[in-house]
């Protein structure tokens, strides 16, 4: 692991040297706790030939210890000041296979970073909390070229992504993410591990895209619509939701029976498989 020191003071000094102020619109909170950094890197279990992509490297607190574990690495950084600072500090001279993409993570075509030679992508990052969900959904569209993803987000969002069916935190994000990926909650990160400290506690989690989905929706866009619309009315029964919704068809008792779902059930009691069966039946009714 890199011997570079990252602590609150060194982060502050580096920001001053780069004449950079953390930008709220980019959701910039810089990780500095070395024990947390070590734990994150170890949890990823990297191999030398991994095709590693880091989103939002910031000051490089994770970048350098990650780079010490692999032969090549690409980072995506929107903030040009930080990207330039990384290029100067790490540079192509000491790491010829280190590439910086100055771009919004939402605008990157991740398929271009994949090749048979380089292999599937292993994506990591401390995502900007204010746009984390859109980035996750963008990455899901490249799931076929991604081996796994390790991200740090607000703890409450990670709890929703990894929630078990029937729990209070189980919802739309749980169903959609678990439809596409296996999810693992890895570790909790306290506010003090960052400079400046965020207002919320963070957590690290893993997403591993299914090579073969356990269940397959006949129309994935419609499946997402059913999940979204039902959880928008999570206190109502499924019968009531489908009866009153302007976006979904009314389902009969036979329709619910066809997918082995109780019409009196509420959305949080349905598994991913239940939602797939429900959306397939609703799509059939709608024609």
Curated annotation (Swiss-Prot):
The transmembrane residues are none
Amino-acid positions noted as binding S-adenosyl-L-methionine in the UniProt annotation, renumbered to this chain:
29, 31, 56, 77, 126
Task: Please state the Enzyme Commission number of this protein.
Answer: 2.1.1.182
Question: Any signal peptide, and if so, which residues?
Answer: none
Q: Which gene encodes it?
A: rsmA
Protein's UniProt name: Ribosomal RNA small subunit methyltransferase A
Q: Which SUPFAM superfamilies match?
A: S-adenosyl-L-methionine-dependent methyltransferases
Q: Where in the cell is it found?
A: Cytoplasm
Name the GO cellular-component terms: cytosol
Reaction catalysed by this enzyme: adenosine(1518)/adenosine(1519) in 16S rRNA + 4 S-adenosyl-L-methionine = N(6)-dimethyladenosine(1518)/N(6)-dimethyladenosine(1519) in 16S rRNA + 4 S-adenosyl-L-homocysteine + 4 H(+)
User: rRNA processing: is it a keyword of this entry?
Assistant: yes
Per the similarity annotation, which family is this?
Belongs to the class I-like SAM-binding methyltransferase superfamily. rRNA adenine N(6)-methyltransferase family. RsmA subfamily.
Q: What does this protein do?
A: Specifically dimethylates two adjacent adenosines (A1518 and A1519) in the loop of a conserved hairpin near the 3'-end of 16S rRNA in the 30S particle. May play a critical role in biogenesis of 30S subunits.
Keyword set includes Acyltransferase: no
Where along the chain is composition biased (Polar residues)?
1-15
Q: Which HAMAP family match?
A: 16SrRNA_methyltr_A (MF_00607)
């Amino acid at each position: 692991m890199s011997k570079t020191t990252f602590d609150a003071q060194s982060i502050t000094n580096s920001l001053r040297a780069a004449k950079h102020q953390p930008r709220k619109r980019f959701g910039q909170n810089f990780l500095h706790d070395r024990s947390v950094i070590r734990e994150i890197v170890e949890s990823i279990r990297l191999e030398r030939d991994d095709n590693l992509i880091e989103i939002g490297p910031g000051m490089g607190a994770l970048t350098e210890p990650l780079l010490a574990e692999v032969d090549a690495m690409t980072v995506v950084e929107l903030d040009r000041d930080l990207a330039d600072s990384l290029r100067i500090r790490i540079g192509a001279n000491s790491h010829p296979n280190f590439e910086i993409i100055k771009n919004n993570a939402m605008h990157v075509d991740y398929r271009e970073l994949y090749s048979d030679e380089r292999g599937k992508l292993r994506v990591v990052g401390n995502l900007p909390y204010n746009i984390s969900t859109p980035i996750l959904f963008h990455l899901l569209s490249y799931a076929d070229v991604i081996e796994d993803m390790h991200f740090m987000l607000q703890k409450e969002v990670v709890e929703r992504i990894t929630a078990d069916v029937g729990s209070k935190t189980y919802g739309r994000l749980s169903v959609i993410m678990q439809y596409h990926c296996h999810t693992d909650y890895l570790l909790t990160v306290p506010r003090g591990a960052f400079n400046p400290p965020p207002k919320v506690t963070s957590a690290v989690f893993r997403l591993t895209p299914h090579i073969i989905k356990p269940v397959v929706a006949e129309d994935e866009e419609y499946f997402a619509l059913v999940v979204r619309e039902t959880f928008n009315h999570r206190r109502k029964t499924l019968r009531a939701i489908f009866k009153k919704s302007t976006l979904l068809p009314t389902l009969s008792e036979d329709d619910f029976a066809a997918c082995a779902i109780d019409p009196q059930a509420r959305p949080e009691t349905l598994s991913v498989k239940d939602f797939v069966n429900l959306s397939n039946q609703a799509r059939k009714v709608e024609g």
